[in-house]
A protein has these predicted regions:
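Short, contiguous pre-domain boundary segments
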Residues: 2-8, 101-105
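Auxiliary, metal-adjacent structural segments of Zn-dependent hydrolase domains
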Residues: 6-61
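Short pre-active-site segment immediately N-terminal to the catalytic Zn-binding motif
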Residues: 64-81
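Post-HEXXH active-site segment of zinc metalloproteases
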Residues: 75-79, 91-122
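Substrate-binding/catalytic groove segments of enzymes
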Residues: 89-100, 128-136
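Long, well-structured alpha-helical subdomains associated
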Residues: 111-113, 117, 122-159
Length: 159
């Protein structure tokens, strides 16, 4: 359901494939969308220099998420993906129908769009990403503990 296109010079996807795939699989299972979406990783040096530059955006007509990766921490990139995936969920529900203005200030001018942004922040950044992060850390901690126990057993058996 999620296709990734890595058009970044840093090959952000290739160098972080396991974590990104884990996150997108988790999101696919936990978010309510029924249409495929594409995530495109792009570089933009000028945007990266702007302290209030664009980090990501969703194109509802193309069902495509663009993530700007230049100079960003992977955790921040994953948060952006999560936020934009909520916009994809909204699009699949039909919440974008009739929307025309997504220019500067749209979230302050349009009550419906403000609600959509609020949902994207709370459901995307707080719930989906945070739940993924906590579950991922818990599973990896359990795996490390199991490996330590296994090594201990092996050492005891070989002595």
């Amino acid at each position: 359901m999620i296709k990734i296109a890595d058009n970044s010079k840093e090959n952000i996807y290739s160098s972080n494939m396991e974590l990104i795939d884990n996150f997108t699989e988790y999101s696919s299972k936990n978010l309510d969308f029924d249409k495929p979406v594409e995530i495109d990783f792009l570089d933009n040096e000028d945007n990266a220099k702007n302290p209030l530059g664009t980090t990501a955006h969703y194109n509802p007509d193309e069902m495509k998420i663009t993530i700007y990766v230049t100079g960003r921490h992977l955790k921040d990139i994953l948060r952006s993906i999560s936020h934009e995936l909520i916009h994809h969920v909204q699009n699949c529900r039909g919440d974008f129908n009739g929307m025309e203005d997504t220019g500067l200030g749209y979230a302050q001018k349009d009550k419906h769009m403000r609600g959509m942004e609020q949902e994207a922040y709370t459901s995307g950044n707080i719930m989906n990403f945070r739940d993924f992060e906590d579950n991922y850390k818990k599973e990896n901690k359990q795996m490390k503990t199991s490996l330590k126990e296994l090594k201990k057993i092996i050492n005891e058996e070989t002595q």
